[in-house]
Amino acid sequence: MFLVNLLILIIPVLLAVAFLTLLERKILGYMQFRKGPNIVGAHGLLQPIADAVKLFTKEPLRPLTSSIYMFILAPILALSLALTIWIPLPMPLPLIDLNLGLLFVLSVSGLSVYSILWSGWASNSKYALTGALRAVAQTISYEVTLAIILLSIMLINGSFTLTTLNLTQEYMWLIVPTWPLMLMWFISTLAETNRAPFDLTEGESELVSGFNVEYAAGPFAMFFLAEYANIIIMNALTVILFFGTYHLIFLPEMSTTTFMIKTMLLTSLFLWIRASYPRFRYDQLMHLLWKNFLPITLVTCLWYIMLPTTLSGLPPQM
């Protein structure tokens, strides 16, 4: 039965990822005054299926000098981790209700660094290795801010369980008292998922395509799916943390629908940002985190530690 539930979770995620690529191309198209994909199917709706067929029917080429096992394992690991993070998410009920759900999400997202590092190192290409090292440095750096923001939210929530956040936000979304944290969290998720304007790992002008430059066909598609699955998961997590997942007084049955609408709106904002802003310089990227975000998040975390004691209030309990 658990396997059936797992499949019911994974298949819609993969479908959502496939159609997110179409949504991105459509949004970028309309923002650049063109139509985007409109040939395959009505209004280009079958384009993701055509792309998948094309990629998975091509021959997966491998450089002769590459490390074969790591080269093959890296995309499999990337996609597996991207799908694993969905397990503790309450939508409105999680697949497994973990006591330390947020810690699990943070740990698994941290492991995705290894897939990037392996792919860059195993490709035996200077462009891939440079892109991988950039990606690893960027991901590890921004995870520091994400962890401190999560700790601040957990101090308000009183538990590491994700389902408790629904009770915490029953009367007011957490974005209202913690909007500076939300802004820093959103920018950090952009950097964590290597999206524009933080897509330095895939700088076409300098690194050809970044850490996945030597990949083609199926393995490339797996990296692609992992990247877009991470975008959706980060936005779903943003909704759970700051926008109250399923509390809808008049229509409690519409909980999953409202959750997905909020996630889709935030994901569209990711794509809008890609179309609007140029790429950061690498030193600016690191300066933003270590000299701006880190001190602010540490101060706010200390503030939330002192707040319950100062006001003699207790965090909500299950």
Swiss-Prot record:
Encoding gene, per UniProt annotation: MT-ND1
Organism of derivation: Ornithorhynchus anatinus
Coiled coil, from the record: none
Protein name (Swiss-Prot/TrEMBL): NADH-ubiquinone oxidoreductase chain 1
InterPro entries to which the protein is assigned, alphabetical: NADH_UbQ_OxRdtase_su1/FPO (IPR001694), NADH_UbQ_OxRdtase_su1_CS (IPR018086)
Disulfide bonds: none
PROSITE patterns hit by this protein: COMPLEX1_ND1_1, COMPLEX1_ND1_2
Keywords: Electron transport, Membrane, Mitochondrion, Mitochondrion inner membrane, NAD, Respiratory chain, Translocase, Transmembrane, Transmembrane helix, Transport, Ubiquinone
EC identifiers of the protein: 7.1.1.2
Membrane topology, from the record: Multi-pass membrane protein
Catalytic activity entry: a ubiquinone + NADH + 5 H(+)(in) = a ubiquinol + NAD(+) + 4 H(+)(out)
TM spans (from-to): 2-22, 68-88, 100-120, 144-164, 171-191, 231-251, 253-273, 293-313
Annotated PANTHER family: NADH DEHYDROGENASE SUBUNIT 1, NADH-UBIQUINONE OXIDOREDUCTASE CHAIN 1
Predominant place of localization: mitochondrion
Any one Gene Ontology molecular-function term assigned to this protein's record: NADH dehydrogenase (ubiquinone) activity
Lineage: Eukaryota, Metazoa, Chordata, Craniata, Vertebrata
GO cellular component: mitochondrial inner membrane; respiratory chain complex I
Signal peptide range: none
